[in-house]
Regions:
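Arg/Lys-rich, positively charged N-terminal/basic patches that mediate binding to nucleic acids
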Residues: 1-27
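A short, surface-exposed loop/turn module that caps and links secondary-structure elements
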Residues: 30-55
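Enriched for short, Lys/Arg-rich terminal
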Residues: 60-62, 66-91
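Non-catalytic, surface-exposed connector residues within folded enzymatic/regulatory domains
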Residues: 3, 25, 36-39, 78
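Nucleotide phosphate-binding site architecture
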Residues: 10, 46, 85
Length: 91
């Protein structure tokens, strides 16, 4: 699986605490191997028409992504649970 990172995702990632960055990288490796691994809690977001999905970094942080084609995904944003879902409403 290939992951493409939005510029906004990269900016958000750089601002995260070191422990969250490490956890996010670990979850990304799991995601590449098995996008529906139980630890990721992969879910399609509402409204479903936006085709946005989330995976869990930990209890507080999420990564929002969109499926592209040919086993490629686009990581759009990373942040705290409440903020990230408000963010997706603007997409």
């Amino acid at each position: 699986m290939e992951i493409i990172y939005a510029d906004e995702f990269v900016k958000q990632f750089k601002r995260l605490p070191k422990s969250i960055k490490q956890r996010a990288l670990k979850q990304e490796l799991i995601f590449k191997e098995n996008p529906i691994h139980p630890s990721l809690n992969t879910e399609k977001l509402i409204p479903r028409s936006k085709e946005l999905w989330s995976i869990r970094v930990d209890r507080k942080y999420r990564i929002i992504f969109r499926h592209l084609e040919n086993r490629t995904v686009y990581f759009l944003a990373i942040g705290e649970h409440d903020w990230i879902y408000k963010y997706t409403n603007r997409l």
